[in-house]
Amino acid sequence: PADPVATGTDSAVGFKPFEASYQILRSGKKHGEASRYLKRDGVGYELGYNSKISWLVFKDERKERSRFVIEQGRLKPSHYLMQRSGTGPSRHYELSLDWAQKQLKTEKKQVVKQIPWNDQWLDMLSFHGQIVLDIQQGKTDFVYDVLNRHGENRTYKYKVATEEWLSLPYGKVKAIRIERYGQGPDKQVYAWLAPELDFLLVRLWQSEDDVEQFDVQLSAYKAQ
């Protein structure tokens, strides 16, 4: 059969290229900045996330990207890359999904991982895009098979919780709050998407053991 990554993509309504900037907060104090972008990449898209954090003597800089096509309302990722530098060891994670050969390759050396192929796979970044498409289709509960950075399958579960107004560095926006569930009571993950900004991620908040880990808030947005 033909490789969908090579043959084309569907154009999704509301799935539009953008550039966005964020402030990374913890306990109300700014500790860094981040940016996200979506751009056309040949027949598909590239979704990227960059962040730079400084907290006391700790420094962390990350660059993350996912390339994918959209077919019949589903994202099909072909390549995922995450690079981390700063305090401690540098990291490089890479995944390649060959839909024609049904092979998953990992690491810089692109070693074939011996794991049963799954047509539902998403990576750590592309599943964000799938949430956007699913919300646009009216879905309120989402279950995804997500490959972690080592190419191991994980189940991610999210649900729509409510719609509410947020006051952000960007300004005041009305957003849909979605919550992750099923990962244990000690970890909470909330994300807010703004319909008026093409369902852009405008805030991301995480807590573990009742301690806030980060609060990423939109500061600037530009549609492409």
Residue ranges and their predicted role:
Residues 1-97, 137-224:
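Acidic, serine/threonine-rich low-complexity disordered tracts
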Residues 89-132:
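Hydrophobic, well-structured mid-protein blocks that either form specific transmembrane helices
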